[in-house]
């Protein structure tokens, strides 16, 4: 299913999330199972299916990584079950530095300084990747679509690093 069509958006990476939320509420009102309580069993089941599609579409378009994956899947590039790793040497080196910094947090006297520095570093790198991803997705070329897939892989890795940093921070606060 093309969620951009469902929510009446052009298939572009940059979308207005406030408009997305408004359209989500409109679609929810239109397909909500309560509206079909007195209809046939088939109509009620169809309503439940459509509600699930609307919910999944909203969650997909709301999240930049999932939105990019959806855009790529519409172009025949499915990243949902892949095990391809990032081959960018500079990114792999940066990844090792971040991993070492994560390991150093617990032994550090000033935990919060390292944590804040990592949050800032992650945010800056994600912003850079996201801008590059948006440009690659908008180009329309097959080569750029493959490059965009690499950016998505990197962003997924960044999300995992962010989660790991948050877990470490939470553990230190306990």
UniProtKB/Swiss-Prot annotation:
Interacts with HscA and stimulates its ATPase activity. InterPro entries: DnaJ_domain, HscB, HscB_C_sf, HscB_oligo_C, J_dom_sf. PANTHER family: IRON-SULFUR CLUSTER CO-CHAPERONE PROTEIN HSCB (PTHR14021:SF15). PROSITE patterns: DNAJ_2. The gene is hscB. It comes from Shewanella oneidensis (strain ATCC 700550 / JCM 31522 / CIP 106686 / LMG 19005 / NCIMB 14063 / MR-1). The keyword Chaperone applies. CDD domains: DnaJ. GO terms for molecular function: ATPase activator activity; protein-folding chaperone binding. Co-chaperone involved in the maturation of iron-sulfur cluster-containing proteins. Seems to help targeting proteins to be folded toward HscA. This is Co-chaperone protein HscB homolog. The lineage of its organism: Bacteria, Pseudomonadati, Pseudomonadota, Gammaproteobacteria, Alteromonadales. Residues 2-74 form the J domain. GO terms for biological process: [2Fe-2S] cluster assembly; protein complex oligomerization; protein folding. It comes from the Bacteria.
